[in-house]
């Protein structure tokens, strides 16, 4: 009996132990990353040929402790390698693990290589050559602290390489992982298996080979034991011939009941070719189809739907994925009553979009990604969520967030008509109208932006996440916007200047119309878009007040108020902001509206410091400071409630005798210190209600706005 070690992906060890035991392995013992077992020659070859889960099967040669690279070299060079293979072979060393003495795997591999070739030289033999591409012999070294194990890799190439895959598409599953997913799915051999997003077909091919009793390595041409002196050719031929006979016998018995669907016809061609190479092309039916129109191909039977849909690291964007998973869940409940469903994904929250309760779940790794496989049992009662294909887009909302969907539909009907009359491209459709859906929905021309407000601490995070996913799904369905034109943002409570933090670097700008102006927006790169929609009427008012006046825009952001003032006939404009990014944006807004000339100044500065040093006066001032800021570029922190009187003192100094200050901020519960302003010689009238547009009338505390003049 030989002592062997089969490696596998973490999480599959127990599954592998069962498989090896069924293949005849003795004394199977699970450890992290694999299974130790004993086998005679026939069982050894059987596990190599038949294991669907093992990554490699190793025959340990040296097990020792080392405390330096010299110990490593001595252990290797002192071993009788001629008993394993002769000097004419090529070899390669895989080295895994490090410790204080062997800090790099390449160094460890080099010392093992040196020990082997030096051993052969001492025996009077020629040095065997190293081959990194296709060596005759592969040596596997594993170092854990001071414990060293050096093995002969009897697999050769890793066992997940079955030999049937020519081209995998964009996001392939390893064959060993696919086999484990099938084994854990609850699928029963002989029953239908459907993959509605099959990609290159790996899940179906692995399952079909299981049913057809095709050994996963039946078509492998090269093995790690080909040049091994202990190789038992007769035992190997017996095991392989048995596998060939079993596959041929089983082929005559099986009827096709594997079905693969995918939207991409190109990847389906790859799947068909892979299935042909795997010897199961006659068992699988392939069809180009959208999951949104998924049909059950075996209505009178019960089987399993298995799927590895796109997730964060694979294809697609978040809104598109939310919509995909949501409609997938609906089709399952309509078409596959009583069936088992098994879905593998790295995004557990996306699986929540299926709106199904998992009966079992398993953790696994897909490369570096932590993934989960969830199994479901579809109710035997047919879902009435979708009754007709033509009604698909409309009836979905009856299942997903119906209250939110109805409110959004109602708002769209009212606000869109108004916006068209006002010649507006950018406006708010929904603003936390329903407490359980704490988010905003804005339209920017052909785009929709969904902004999630941070949930209160007493709201369960998972529940809030589920509601967001439902709301995104409903928004896509109600608005009819394409998934690539829905932008999803998570908005936390603002701290300091983090509203200016960059989220992405796509650089995708387009302009929207607002009361005859054109303004650039960017929906993806920042938390905000470059245009505060709630201040639309404030900007319009500034344009109406600006004719013939010197205008100052303080805390200017992207300068949209400056554009209105300039087009309203301002004699001059001065735009001040601390951010160079937003000043450049403001400049582009001016250029877009054909506003040019030396009378339009853009100044990058700390607004408070600049104001203290300013020596000219203005007839119209717009100041819209942040609620709070502690930017490193500011000498002091800023709090609008605490510091607004100081700001007014400085603004009064630069305000002409008949001038007007339009002051606004977004602090909820802001209290203007009217007594202090009167002492400064200023009067303030709140005009918040006049600056609140129709699309924000549901949120009367979105901002407060004041008209301030000399007494």
Curated annotation (Swiss-Prot):
User: Where mainly located?
Assistant: cytoplasm
Q: Which residues form a coiled coil?
A: none
Keyword vocabulary terms for this entry? Cytoplasm, Methyltransferase, RNA-binding, rRNA processing, S-adenosyl-L-methionine, Transferase
Q: Which reaction does it catalyse?
A: guanosine(2445) in 23S rRNA + S-adenosyl-L-methionine = N(2)-methylguanosine(2445) in 23S rRNA + S-adenosyl-L-homocysteine + H(+); guanosine(2069) in 23S rRNA + S-adenosyl-L-methionine = N(2)-methylguanosine(2069) in 23S rRNA + S-adenosyl-L-homocysteine + H(+)
- Classify the source by domain of life: Bacteria
Give the matching PROSITE patterns: THUMP, UPF0020
Any idea where this protein resides? Cytoplasm
**Domain THUMP span(s) in chain numbering:** 43-154
* Regions crossing the membrane: none
Q: Per the record, GO CC terms?
A: cytoplasm
Task: Kindly list the GO molecular function terms attached to this UniProt entry.
Answer: 23S rRNA (guanine(2445)-N(2))-methyltransferase activity; RNA binding; rRNA (guanine-N2-)-methyltransferase activity; rRNA (guanine-N7-)-methyltransferase activity
Q: What is its EC number?
A: 2.1.1.173, 2.1.1.264
Name the protein family.
Belongs to the methyltransferase superfamily. RlmKL family.
Q: Which HAMAP family match?
A: 23SrRNA_methyltr_KL
Protein role: Specifically methylates the guanine in position 2445 (m2G2445) and the guanine in position 2069 (m7G2069) of 23S rRNA.
Name of the protein described by the UniProt record:
Ribosomal RNA large subunit methyltransferase K/L
What organism, scientifically named, is this protein from?
Haemophilus influenzae (strain ATCC 51907 / DSM 11121 / KW20 / Rd)
From the UniProt record, report the name of the gene that encodes this protein.
rlmL
């Amino acid at each position: 009996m030989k002592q062997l070690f089969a490696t596998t992906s973490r999480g599959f060890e127990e599954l592998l132990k069962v498989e090896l035991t069924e293949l005849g392995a003795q004394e199977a013992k699970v450890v992290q990353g694999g299974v130790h077992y004993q086998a005679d020659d026939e069982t050894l070859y059987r596990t190599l040929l038949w294991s669907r889960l093992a990554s490699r099967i190793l025959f340990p040669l040296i097990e020792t402790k080392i405390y330096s690279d010299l110990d490593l070299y001595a252990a290797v060079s002192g071993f009788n390698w001629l008993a394993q293979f002769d000097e004419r072979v090529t070899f390669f060393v895989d080295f895994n693990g490090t410790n204080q003495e062997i800090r790099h795997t390449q160094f460890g591999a080099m010392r093992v290589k040196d020990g082997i070739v030096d051993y052969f030289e001492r025996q009077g033999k020629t040095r065997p050559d190293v081959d990194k591409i296709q060596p005759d012999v592969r040596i596997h070294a594993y170092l854990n602290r001071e414990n060293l194990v050096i093995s002969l890799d009897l697999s050769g190439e890793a066992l997940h390489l079955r030999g049937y895959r020519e081209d995998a598409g964009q996001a392939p599953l390893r064959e060993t992982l696919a086999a484990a997913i099938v084994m854990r799915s609850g699928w029963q051999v002989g029953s239908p298996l459907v993959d509605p997003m099959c990609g290159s077909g790996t899940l179906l091919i692995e399952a079909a080979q299981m049913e057809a009793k095709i050994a996963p390595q039946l078509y492998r041409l090269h093995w790690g034991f080909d040049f091994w002196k202990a190789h038992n050719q007769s035992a190997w031929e017996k095991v392989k011939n048995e596998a060939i006979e079993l596959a041929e016998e089983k082929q005559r018995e099986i009827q096709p009941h594997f079905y693969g669907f995918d939207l991409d016809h190109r990847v389906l061609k790859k799947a068909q070719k892979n299935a042909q190479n795997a010897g199961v092309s006659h068992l699988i039916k392939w069809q180009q189809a959208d999951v949104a129109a998924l049909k059950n191909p075996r209505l009178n039977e019960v089987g399993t739907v298995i799927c590895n849909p796109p997730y964060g690291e694979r294809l697609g964007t978040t809104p598109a994925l939310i919509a995909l998973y949501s409609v997938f869940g609906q089709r399952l409940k309509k078409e596959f009553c009583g069936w088992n469903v098994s879905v593998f994904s790295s995004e557990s929250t996306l699986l929540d979009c299926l709106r199904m309760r998992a009966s079992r779940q398993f953790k696994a790794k897909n490369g570096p990604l932590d993934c989960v496989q969830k199994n479901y049992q579809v109710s035997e009662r047919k879902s009435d969520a979708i009754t007709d294909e033509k009604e698909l887009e409309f009836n979905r909302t009856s299942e997903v967030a119906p209250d939110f969907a109805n409110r959004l539909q109602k708002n769209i009907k009212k606000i869109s008509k108004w916006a068209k009359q006002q010649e507006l491209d950018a406006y708010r459709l929904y603003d936390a109208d329903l407490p359980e859906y704490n988010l905003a929905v804005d339209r920017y021309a052909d785009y929709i932006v969904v902004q999630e407000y941070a949930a209160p601490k007493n709201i369960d995070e998972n529940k809030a996440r589920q509601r967001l996913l439902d709301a995104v799904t409903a928004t896509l369905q109600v608005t009819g916007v394409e998934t690539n034109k829905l932008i999803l943002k998570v908005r936390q409570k603002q701290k300091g200047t983090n509203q200016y933090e960059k989220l992405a670097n796509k650089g995708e700008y387009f302009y929207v119309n607002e009361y005859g102006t054109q303004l650039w927006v960017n929906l993806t790169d920042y938390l905000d878009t470059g245009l505060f929609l709630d201040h639309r009427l404030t900007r319009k008012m500034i344009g109406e007040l600006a004719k013939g006046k010197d205008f100052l825009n303080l805390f200017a952001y992207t300068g949209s108020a400056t554009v209105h003032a300039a087009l309203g006939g301002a004699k001059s404009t001065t735009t001040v902001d601390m951010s160079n990014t937003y000043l450049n944006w403001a400049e582009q807004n001016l250029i877009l509206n054909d506003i040019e000339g030396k009378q339009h100044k853009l100044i990058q500065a700390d607004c408070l410091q600049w104001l203290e040093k300013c020596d000219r006066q203005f007839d119209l001032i717009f100041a819209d400071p942040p609620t709070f800021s502690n930017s490193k570029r500011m000498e002091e922190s800023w709090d609008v409630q605490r510091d607004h009187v100081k700001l007014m003192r400085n603004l009064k100094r630069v305000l002409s005798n008949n001038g007007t200050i339009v002051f606004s901020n977004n602090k909820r519960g802001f209290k203007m210190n009217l007594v202090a302003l009167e002492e400064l010689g200023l009067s303030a009238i709140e005009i918040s209600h006049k600056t609140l547009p129709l699309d924000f009338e549901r949120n009367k505390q979105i901002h407060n706005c004041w008209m301030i003049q000399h007494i």
